[in-house]
Amino acid sequence: MYKRRTSPKIKRNNIENTIPRVNREYACPAGPCGINYRMSRNPAVAGQFYPGTTKELDRAVRLYTRDAEEKIRAKGIVVPHAGYVYSGGVAGEVFSTVTIPDRSVIFCPNHTGVGAEAAVMSRGAWRMPWGEVPIDGELADRLLAASPLLSEDASAHRGEHSLEVQLPFLRRFREAFRFVPVALGHLSLSDCRALGEAVARIAGEETRPPLLIASSDMSHYEPDGIARKKDGAAIDRMLSLDPEGLFRVVRSERISMCGVIPATVVLFASLALGATSARLVKYSTSGDVSGDRGQVVGYAGLAFL
């Protein structure tokens, strides 16, 4: 059995502090929502980052996805989390390309700074426009027991948008599914390795291995050309299956990749599960939609195979 662990509130890193705190749907907001006494989390960004009604949401998700004739089996994926009008095409293509199992472990950055540094919500469900999506409590318990870095903490997920926006895409290809939400703060490289390898041990023991998902946008508020150059450096490290290189280049080149920690963890886990290659499924920037190339956010979709 695991012991309930708590951690002090985390601070935003210097990169996040350089991002203007405005509610732009092509980037990352911090908004309120609630978790009631039955541990049902209310949506934080329904009607903002994605349509708030089931009918309109289904229409939007179908616009950004397709029924691929052949699917690839991925150990892990990286997908963006902005408003669907900006990053839906990238996220949708990744979810369209890979096989979607009935369970996923989703790692997202903690934009709000609330809660533990590696926070798992292990019970209850997340309310979405179509109904509730249940958390896989058994898998969550096994993950908590496997890594002392993880803490049971629902508060970190209360206002976090970057995991919530992935659920409609999962539902598009798997009507009934469970998931484990994990919000990550500022872990060291060694902690990313330890956590990724612990996750891989648990996932590798499952008869139905979960899909490991890292939620991340790329460069924030850079001119389009600079964003593409910086993002290219990070993408190159991911395509080379080099989590250490990814972690370091994001810092050395000051790439404002908000989900570098989730991506590093999932890359370590995918390697431990036997990944031998990676594929860049799609890349774009917000400028491809808005036409504004002066300040863009980058979106990359990758699969680790």
Question: What is each PLM-predicted segment?
Answer:
Residues 9, 34-36:
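Short, positively charged and aromatic/hydrophobic N-terminal segments
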Residues 40-268, 272-275, 281-290:
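Active-site histidine-anchored catalytic micro-motif
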Residues 281, 286-305:
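Short, basic/aromatic-enriched C-terminal tail that caps enzymatic domains
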